[in-house]
């Protein structure tokens, strides 16, 4: 059952707003902290703008920052004052291990629950394209044929022949 607006956690509100921004502007890789805060005020999901939104966008929800009372992994800091939604495969502060990544379906307000399905697809596609775009990961397996006829131990022995 969708949650009442008054019961919506600030962290869940921040996640919803960030998801709305990503869905509306898929060409943008990330957003300024101020954009997220402004969109939260504009959406007014839980009523008038709440003062905790800013600190959640800056600190509490940011996976790759040391936790400060909250261990959420909902956002990822891409640069100074820049955020995007966290996705599996992103690095995060070790103390945030096991932290909440998305709102629970039963905690989503009416009209926003489809964002969870959108997020699963977006996150999956983003992971695939990140792997394909990474030049180091693209090299995986490229040298396999170089050593296909020689074991690693034999190769090292051959290299060391004649040392001393």
Predicted regions and their residues:
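Phospho-regulated, low-complexity intrinsically disordered regions of nuclear gene-regulatory
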Residues: 2-21, 47, 51-138
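DNA-recognition alpha helix
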Residues: 17-21, 32-46
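Short aromatic-glycine motifs in intrinsically disordered, low-complexity regions
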Residues: 23-26
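Flexible coil/turn residues that form the inter-helical turn or adjacent wing/linker of helix-turn-helix
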Residues: 29
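Short coil/turn segments at secondary-structure boundaries
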Residues: 32, 70-74, 152
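Short linear interaction segments
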Residues: 131-164
């Amino acid at each position: 059952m969708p949650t009442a607006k008054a019961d919506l956690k600030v962290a869940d509100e921040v996640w919803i707003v960030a998801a709305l921004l990503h869905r509306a502007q898929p060409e943008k890789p990330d957003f300024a902290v101020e954009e997220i805060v402004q969109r939260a005020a504009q959406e007014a999901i839980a009523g008038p703008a709440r003062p905790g939104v800013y600190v959640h966008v800056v600190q509490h929800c940011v996976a790759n920052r040391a936790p400060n009372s909250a261990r959420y992994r909902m956002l990822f800091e891409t640069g100074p004052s820049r955020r995007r939604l966290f996705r599996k495969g992103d690095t995060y502060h070790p103390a945030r291990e096991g932290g909440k990544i998305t709102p629970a379906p039963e905690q989503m307000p009416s009209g926003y629950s489809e964002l969870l399905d959108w997020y699963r697809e977006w996150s999956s596609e983003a992971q695939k394209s990140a792997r394909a775009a990474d030049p180091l990961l693209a090299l995986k397996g490229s040298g396999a044929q170089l050593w296909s006829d020689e074991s690693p131990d034999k190769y090292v022995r051959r290299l060391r022949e004649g040392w001393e």
